[in-house]
């Protein structure tokens, strides 16, 4: 069975079962966290922007991990942790002076402030967790043995150089208007085109940006 190095991916794109053969290089500490979680009966994957950037041959700024373990269970398994967002299922695990955000699979409730869900519900389903994410290129998870999990065709969109929302763009942008700026930023940084329905959602809901704080806009 062939294994594909990250640097070879831009020359060819993979779909279906070939995702399983994909090999991304992840930090040893991130892999150690995955292993510890799995040895204790939990699922765990690196997820989101780090997977996207690795496939594109870019160096990720950080490595986020998603898991079926609850925040309390994560804290029991690791000696050094920081409660960075327990209400949203996130614990930062410290390894050799590096921090890795470990977040429980979750389903988001209604967004009442255009930024955060009113409540989150933990789930045992990776699919449900990936479904809540903003864009298809950010909704992929990776495991060193099981390979790439790409339920929303993020690889195909990267191949076509497209920014596309996961699910209904109107819902995604209504949940958090800052995603509008994020779509534009990704389009500019990566040279990708914003997909038609996603672009329409931006056009309709752009006025909601007036409710986003200047600090968040500047950070984005």
Spans of model-derived segments:
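Catalytic cores of the polymerase beta-like nucleotidyltransferase superfamily
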Residues: 2-220
């Amino acid at each position: 069975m062939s294994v594909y190095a990250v640097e070879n991916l831009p020359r060819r794109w993979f779909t279906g079962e070939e995702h399983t053969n994909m090999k991304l290089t992840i930090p040893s500490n991130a892999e150690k966290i995955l292993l510890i979680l799995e040895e204790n009966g939990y699922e765990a994957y690196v997820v989101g922007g780090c997977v996207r950037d690795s496939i594109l041959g870019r160096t990720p700024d950080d490595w986020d991990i998603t898991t079926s373990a609850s925040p309390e269970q994560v804290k029991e398994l690791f000696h050094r942790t920081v409660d960075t967002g327990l209400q949203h299922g996130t614990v930062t695990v410290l390894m050799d002076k590096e921090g890795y955000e470990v977040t429980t699979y979750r389903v988001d409730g209604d967004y009442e402030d255009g930024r955060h869900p009113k409540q989150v519900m933990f789930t045992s389903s990776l699919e449900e967790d990936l479904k809540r994410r903003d864009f298809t290129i950010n909704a992929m998870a990776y495991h060193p043995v099981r390979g790439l999990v790409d339920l929303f065709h993020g690889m195909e969109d990267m191949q076509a150089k497209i920014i596309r929302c996961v699910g209904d763009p109107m819902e995604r942008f209504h949940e958090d208007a800052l995603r509008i700026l994020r779509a534009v930023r990704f389009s500019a940084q990566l040279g990708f085109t914003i997909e038609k329905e996603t672009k329409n959602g931006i056009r309709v809901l752009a006025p909601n940006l007036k409710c986003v704080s200047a600090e968040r806009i500047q950070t984005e």
